[in-house]
Amino acid sequence: MSLFDWFADRRKGQFVGKVSQETEESDGLWVKCPECGQVVYRKDLHANASVCSNCGYHHRIDSDERIVLIADQGSFKSLDRNLSPTDPLGFKDRRAYADRLRESQASTGMKDGVVTGLCQVEGMPMAMAVMDFRFMGGSMGSVVGEKITRLVERATAQGLPLLIVCASGGARMQEGMLSLMQMAKISGALERHREAELLYMPLLTHPTTGGVTASFAMLGDLILAEPKALIGFAGRRVIEQTLREKLPDNFQTAEYLQEHGFVDTIVPRTQLRKTLASLLLLHGCKAKKAAGK
């Protein structure tokens, strides 16, 4: 076994097993819930925001589905859609980074792993970024960082509240230091947004890990999370081996983080839009008046 193979095997077990075990059947009329085993009619699952009606398990959804659930119908206006990543390091492990990018772009129809734009929630304007785990595990490279930074800067300039839906394995190793510097770049933009006394809310979904957790995911005025989402920096196995202690079964879950003060509230997906609207109202946001009124 080569050094790379050894490292890859170790990395596979770095995070809680649920992430890899929750793969769902993507074709057909029925979906089996990985939490309770219930077989659900796909249309019924989608009608319930992809939440299992039997156990409440939140199935993973893509960025398009997320936008439909949050934004007023027809209100989302995408920004920087044509920004596309390059391969500045000529990186290659088992496969070339350029090949991985092309594969992810073909399978998702996206240029990179985040969609950014402006929208309304019950008539109230808001800037929103939605990370998509389908694209290379939602990893944060230079384009993801640039798009989020541009969105934060636009929100600051226009006096808008900001929501970032996080779903990521962390910084994209194929871009090396260029990916790591996005942590500081986004954090700096968020600090200027905070200085303008504007609301920022990250929504932590399953999973939110690595460099994303270590930067903008934890810098919100109000930190929201979906039920049972995996949230952490290093993986469970790494922490246990470092501390030489057994960690609690619910360690790195949204519920554990809320109990220890790292998450403000856990919001079921079916209640998210209503909750966001209430929080926007609470922070003084007002609905736009219809034209001619």
UniProtKB/Swiss-Prot annotation:
Pathway it works in: Lipid metabolism; malonyl-CoA biosynthesis; malonyl-CoA from acetyl-CoA: step 1/1
Domain CoA carboxyltransferase N-terminal: 29-293
InterPro entries, per the entry: AcCoA_carboxyl_beta, Acetyl_CoA_COase_Trfase_b_su, ClpP/crotonase-like_dom_sf, COA_CT_N, Znf-ACC
SUPFAM superfamilies: ClpP/crotonase (SSF52096)
Keyword Cytoplasm appears in the UniProt entry: yes
Record note on cofactor: Binds 1 zinc ion per subunit.
EC number: 2.1.3.15
Annotated family: Belongs to the AccD/PCCB family.
Assembly description: Acetyl-CoA carboxylase is a heterohexamer composed of biotin carboxyl carrier protein (AccB), biotin carboxylase (AccC) and two subunits each of ACCase subunit alpha (AccA) and ACCase subunit beta (AccD).
Protein name: Acetyl-coenzyme A carboxylase carboxyl transferase subunit beta
Organism annotation: Prochlorococcus marinus (strain MIT 9313)
